[in-house]
Design a protein with these regions (language model features):
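Enzyme catalytic cores with a strong preference for nitrogen-chemistry domains
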Residues: 1-217
Length: 217
């Protein structure tokens, strides 16, 4: 299995521009023989989208842009793409005027293949410390009642996690129980000294404990 990491320079709110970057990166990877392309956490919306998430029109536009990416890559036969994006179940109107409404939005990653959105995974562990305030905007994937996202790619079973999920054992354990041999972990978070080393150590810990290999992005 050949994997490409689409490390695009996303701009918050620029759905058209971010989608274009994802499509272009995926096409380049496909031309070089990649089976799987992984884009970063919330790469479609840009990170962090914050109060844009409270606008129903923005959430609908995200869903339309995601489907547009899938259609744009329909001719890339055999290519699978994982894209990070905001995801919403249903529509309760503008939550800025309904402070008591339960959040329906999720920090998600979707598998695109064959011109369509095949499956979606919702982040389970939401950071809410230092610069992170994801619980203000997102519900945990546990509330979505979803199974782990595990799919076959060139003969390898790939599980999907999102950022903070990899810092806890349960999401990786769930992916392994669903048959994952490899994890694709989407990330987007601020840099600090030795962060790369910390991530590498944590991914190695997850790999040794749960899986044979881990891809991180």
């Amino acid at each position: 299995m050949k994997v490409a990491l689409a490390q695009i320079n996303a701009t918050v709110g620029d759905l058209e521009g971010n989608a274009r970057q994802i499509v272009e990166a995926a096409r380049r990877a496909h031309a070089q023989g990649a089976h799987l392309v992984v884009a970063p956490e919330l790469s479609l919306s840009g990170y962090p989208p914050e109060d844009l998430l409270l606008r129903p029109a923005f959430m609908r536009a995200c869903a339309e842009a995601l489907e547009g990416i899938a259609r744009s890559l329909a001719d890339c036969v055999g290519l699978q793409v994982v894209v990070g994006h905001p995801h919403q179940f249903g529509d309760r109107g503008d939550v800025r005027t309904k402070s008591t409404a339960q959040p329906l939005r999720f920090n998600a990653a979707s598998l695109l293949a064959g011109g369509r959105v095949v499956a979606t995974y919702c982040k389970r562990e939401l950071p809410n410390y230092q610069v992170f305030d994801e619980r203000r905007y997102f519900a945990s994937g546990r509330d979505a009642g979803q199974s782990p996202l595990v799919f076959d790619c060139a003969g390898t079973r790939v599980g999907v996690l999102i950022c903070e999920d990899a810092w806890f054992d349960e999401p990786a354990a769930g992916a392994k129980a669903a048959g994952a041999q490899v994890l694709a972990v989407l990330n987007a978070s601020p840099f600090h000294l030795d962060k790369a080393g910390e991530r590498e150590a944590r991914m190695a810990e997850r790999a040794y404990a749960r899986l044979s290999k881990v891809f991180r992005h």
